[in-house]
Curated annotation (Swiss-Prot):
The modification Phosphoserine is found at residues 379, 395, 432, 439, 450. This is U4/U6 small nuclear ribonucleoprotein Prp31. Residues 1-43, 334-357 are annotated as: Disordered. GO terms for molecular function: identical protein binding; protein-macromolecule adaptor activity; ribonucleoprotein complex binding; snRNP binding; U4 snRNA binding; U4atac snRNA binding. The gene is Prpf31. It comes from the Eukaryota. There is a cross-link at residues 471, 478 (Glycyl lysine isopeptide (Lys-Gly) (interchain with G-Cter in SUMO2)). It comes from Mus musculus.
Length: 499
């Protein structure tokens, strides 16, 4: 029988064997079964050795002796050649890893034995110190004398100051009875056995951790030496582990059974050793399943590297672990802050001006005149002259009424007067100067002045109003003209110049 077959034969649960042996098949997860406790512990015995038999077993002594033997030897990486399962030390590592589980069960049995025996002396201590090892150390320290709770330095190394104060107050009012010397001796024996088993468990952990760095260095870096040894033992060796897909590696060590009478709500389906490893448990609960899938995928790669004895220094393992931690940090990052978009620039279109000097003058110029106001005004209760629509057109209102007795005169309003721009005024002024024209701007004459005159003799006579001015201008052009120049005249005979 090969070593892999022996490891498979050592598995306790047949369901785990099926799970470890099926790689590509996806079979439906069976319902959680109720199993009865196989052995009913008889705690009425006088000695703890009658119920806790692991300490005196031959298997425990052989494994611990081999562990001490291999610890004394210096491990060498070059000794690990070929399949890891063929290494002589590999079997010891797997057995030692399985032994830690049995030690945990044995410690629970001893704790229950001590609790039942010591409840005669101090029944309240069980509720004050819930931890099993702390309870065992406290019982060994107190013994039959509960006054040791006060000012005890050894007890301060076991319990916190607040717990010590509560224990001392409760011990002063307890209704417990004194233990006999024989009962106290049996309790001390049970306490010593529990503490020695706990020390052996830590010794096994140190050994497995030191040796897993040579057998599977990359896998140990990712999930730790203890978890790596557990999944290797369940899978049947490193070679079988390297052949398994990540979805099956994640389920190795899944608890699919529970004791009868206990609730199954706390049992997490599809969770194994990887889910309960430190690297996954360090995350919030809502990310642990996702993290377990990621770690299982990286463990598959690391196991394949270790099975071929590559990257013995763990370089690949450190790279995979860094990648896992980066993804963990990315998952736990807070969501990005929503970018506040600025408001778009408003459309500066032409807006209606509602004030200002220019606007007020424009309203005066384009506003309603008095005539238009009179035309728009109507009297209440009076019949209009055009009420029967005899004339086509708009009604004239008050403007069309007769007999008002007032003479309408055109009101000259500076605001409504026609305006000429300054540029046009300068242009007209230049034209009047050049062409000698006359205008109301140049001369203060009436704008109705005309060259047509009415005389009693001839009737209608056309008169040039500029004739007099023209005569004066012609006279001045001879001698007093501003345009006169010197003229050079050559004489016919003498050749003299005259002006």
């Amino acid at each position: 029988m090969s070593l892999a077959d022996e490891l498979l034969a050592d598995l306790e649960e047949a369901a785990e064997e099926e799970e470890g042996g099926s790689y590509g098949e996806e079979e439906e997860e069976p319902a959680i079964e109720d199993v009865q406790e196989e052995t009913q512990l008889d705690l009425s015995g006088d000695s703890v050795k009658s119920i806790a038999k692991l300490w005196d077993s031959k298997m425990f002594a052989e494994i611990m002796m081999k562990i001490e033997e291999y610890i004394s030897k210096q491990a060498n990486v070059s000794e690990v050649m070929g399949p890891v399962e063929a290494a002589p030390e590999y079997r010891v590592i797997v057995d030692a890893n399985n032994l830690t589980v049995e030690i945990e069960n044995e410690l629970n049995i001893i704790h229950k034995f001590i609790r039942d025996k010591y409840s005669k002396r101090f029944p309240e201590l069980e509720s004050l110190v819930p931890n099993a090892l702390d309870y065992i150390r406290t019982v060994k320290e107190l013994g039959n004398s509960l006054d040791k709770c006060k000012n005890n330095e050894n007890l301060q190394q076991i319990l916190t100051n607040a717990t010590i104060m509560v224990v001392s107050v409760t011990a002063s009012t307890t209704q417990g009875q004194q233990l006999s010397d024989e009962e106290l001796e049996r309790l001390e024996e049970a306490c010593d056995m529990a503490l020695e088993l706990n020390a052996s468990k830590h010794r096994i952990y140190e050994y497995v951790e030191s040796r897993m760095s040579f057998i599977a260095p990359n896998l140990s870096i990712i999930i730790g030496a203890s978890t790596a040894a557990k999944i290797m033992g369940v899978a049947g060796g490193l070679t079988n582990l390297s052949k398994m897909p990540a979805c099956n590696i994640m389920l190795l060590g899944a608890q699919r059974k529970t004791l009868s009478g206990f609730s199954s709500t706390s049992v997490l389906p599809h969770t194994g050793y990887i889910y309960h490893s430190d690297i996954v448990q360090s995350l919030p609960p809502d990310l642990r399943r996702k993290a377990a899938r990621l770690v299982a995928a990286k463990c598959t790669l690391a196991a394949r590297v270790d099975s071929f004895h590559e990257s013995t220094e763990g370089k690949v393992g450190y790279e995979l672990k860094d990648e896992i931690e980066r993804k963990f940090d990315k998952w736990q990052e807070p969501p990005p802050v929503k970018q506040v978009k600025p408001l778009p620039a408003p459309l500066d279109g032409q807006r209606k001006k509602r004030g200002g000097r220019r606007y007020r003058k424009m309203k005066e110029r384009l506003g309603l005149t008095e005539i238009r106001k009179q035309a728009n005004r109507m009297s209440f209760g009076e019949i209009e002259e055009d009420a029967y629509q005899e004339d086509l057109g708009f009604s004239l209102g008050h403007l069309g009424k007769s007999g008002s007795g007032r003479v309408r005169q055109t009101q000259v309003n500076e605001a409504t007067k026609a305006r000429i721009s300054k540029t046009l005024q300068r242009t007209l002024q230049k034209q009047s100067v050049v062409y000698g024209g006359k205008s109301t701007i140049r001369d203060r004459s009436s704008g109705t002045a005309s060259s047509v005159a009415f005389t009693p003799l001839q009737g209608l006579e056309i008169v040039n109003p500029q004739a007099a001015e023209k005569k004066v201008a012609e006279a001045n052009q001879k001698y007093f003209s501003s345009m006169a120049e010197f003229l050079k005249v050559k004489g016919e005979k003498s050749g003299t110049m005259s002006t």
